[in-house]
């Protein structure tokens, strides 16, 4: 449970490359996420080419930290799933699993949503020549945190948001 409480959005990274086995464990964690009807609607693009990461930062005004990251991942939503109304929930669980595994590996991440933003979808679709069978869901910047205690605990618990048996 400590990993859940240590996860923070990290936007400053060292230049240290991420070991392939850590990337593999993050992807494995993502793919262990629950999904409606076990549809597993995810695919991933792993980007470690610096030039590509720098260009990727243009997909959103909120992606300014990307050029400083040694690794980026694009989480893709497979189309034509059995339970399409639930794919966003499935993908959210996969992204959270990936980010929690990153913390366990000593890494920091930040999640940049694509959502249903047509400009962001078009940018990523064109840049990565995505087929119609997938849509971009999220972009993650990943790296070793440049600041000490970047994944420090901040208590966000708010008892006023908890309701028992009725609202």
Per-segment meaning from a language model:
Residues 1-167:
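Acidic, surface-exposed loops and disordered segments
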């Amino acid at each position: 449970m400590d990993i859940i409480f240590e996860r923070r959005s990290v936007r400053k990274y060292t230049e240290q490359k991420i070991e392939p086995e850590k990337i593999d464990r993050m992807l494995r964690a993502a793919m262990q996420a629950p999904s409606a009807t076990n549809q597993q609607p995810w695919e991933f693009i792993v980007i470690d080419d610096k030039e590509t990461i720098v260009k990727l930062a243009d997909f959103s005004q909120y992606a300014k930290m990307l050029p400083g990251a040694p690794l980026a991942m694009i989480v893709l939503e497979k189309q034509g799933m059995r339970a399409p109304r639930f794919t966003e929930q499935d993908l959210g669980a996969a992204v959270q699993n990936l980010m929690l595994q990153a913390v366990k590996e000593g890494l920091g991440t930040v999640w940049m949503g694509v959502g249903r933003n047509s400009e962001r979808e078009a940018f990523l679709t064109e840049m990565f020549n995505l087929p119609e069978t997938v849509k971009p869901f999220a972009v993650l910047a990943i790296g070793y945190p440049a600041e000490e205690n970047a994944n420090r605990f901040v208590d966000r618990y708010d008892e006023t948001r908890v309701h028992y048996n009725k609202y």
